[in-house]
């Protein structure tokens, strides 16, 4: 805490002063409400709705509503909200983020704002990170809402459209962030209004809000169809990548080097900048690529695809690592989530990176998919009228929550004081020395019966430590992406006395680790971190596994100067300093220089990652504005509005466009190029050919005459249909078909533009500005193409022609974790679940021990 905060207090402290009087008012109703009968308590819901109808606001009835939920929780679940939980509930109602420590009962907190906001009858969405939590919370907390007369729905990955629609129609709906986002995209691909499943996006409460809005912000939701693109180029570039020689990275050029115009001597064919995760070819490398592909100029725009694929192949080889970023299972490349350590089946890296890794690992290279619909979580959740979030760790990212989502973070005090002891970092010169010390610490804790959770940031480290502990005869469990099926069982055992658990970030959140009495007496759970994560927030999550609800516990991080974080981001002088001091391999180092270096390194990375997310949002904002326009137009069609006026405008706009292209103001009528006018006009609007007419003297008169003819032609077409609604439905069908086809092509075009836009920087132009300008031009071209295609199709429609709405493209999948197929407008590939498979609900249990029992 800085000096200013010590004197004036933190933002959270100021906000809590404002919130405390509201919490006092809630508590003042406790005695009165405890005397109400069940019927009287249930009747409160109807009373609140009537008061809202008469003009009272949610803020007016909040104290009584929260007191009602509190009393219902006590009667139905035997759980009464603590004061700190009421404070958390008030923060959530205000559309903010409540930071509450692990074990403080965030699930119960959620019932307060969910109930209050559901009284408006506009729907409340409680968003969780997996199906297991959505199902558990809906069935558990739903009992309170049901008791008070509200309906509770749940959306799971294998539900059909009718079930989803019914769930979203409930007062309160529990759903995962992925299912919700994909339902939004699918709704905007629907061809009939009856296929829509979502209501308007009114209010949502996001559990683990940092995971959803920060960690997943860089990965857009994508619904894809099959692309016709060949995979041969990926395999060729992989062959090339193996032949190229890695050069030396000399770091970023200093200001002095730039001023003195010093040239850095390049060696090798390419340079890898691990810090910024960038690969660049040298002059020598570019020459080799040109020879390999028999091309004259690598930088030519027609070689954009080769440029992209060569970079991907080098990234796959030198920046993506097996058993850290991905694993190979059943001849398939599966992504490992860097924040949770979990495997993400069904999810693929975009832009061809996944195919490049498949080529590198010699597994079958799957065809790249065509994007049919896409949106980022940033833009999706900003569509809600009001949103709130809960998490144990958000303060470190408050700047981002404020800047991108307009949400501030309020730290809620714990119900009981935190008894966990957080030790200073233990720093060693080498990794070997660090791991030796970790093993000694584990052995010492195990011998006195204290449970230990060792956190690692990748699979390799967890397996290395496991081997070292086996040699010392220490029984232990390993939890990483390779053994994720056993997660629930391993976490349940982790709090028992003498238990030793080695886990990747998977154990960082989710199920609580409960201590037995002997473990409590031995000092509680000891957390040992084997490396600092790039994000302080992930380190804090690991620490937070110990010391829940006043339990004893300890946390300690072991670090070496050879760790990636220190190697890439800390000062190089540190290693030299400790070498001069004669520090041995197994000597522990403690120095203020080190603590500062670690914190500075993490802050650097966090700032860098924040910059990347802001940069991505700048690009996506262009697509978002265009998406809003297209989806609004689609919704008009689905809502069954008459599109006649829009069609008439398209007809007249098209005519005007043709005349403007072919006729200049300074030429007389006998000089006009009538062949060109007919060439552009007649294939779309088959009127009589345009010829010289002495009565038509200028451009405006020609435009007026041709508009009248075109409108008359369309009116004659309308008259051919005995039922007016027939032609209205045909207009809707044609518009939907054309909009969808052109929009899908436009998504691809914008993606191609984004991939190549970086080259604009070489011409001293801002790539983002250029992307916006070119993107808007492309959007304008697309809308003109929609006008032309729609008019042409309608002008040539025949009365006997059968016209039905149909999907423009077949959906083949999404980029997120998926279970069995969902029937309806979106088709997913159905996969058989075997008894020993991980249950698709996300519980971490085997299918036979979970949902398979009920099957």
List the predicted regions and their residue ranges.
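Short Cys/His-rich zinc-binding micro-motifs
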Residues: 829-848, 852
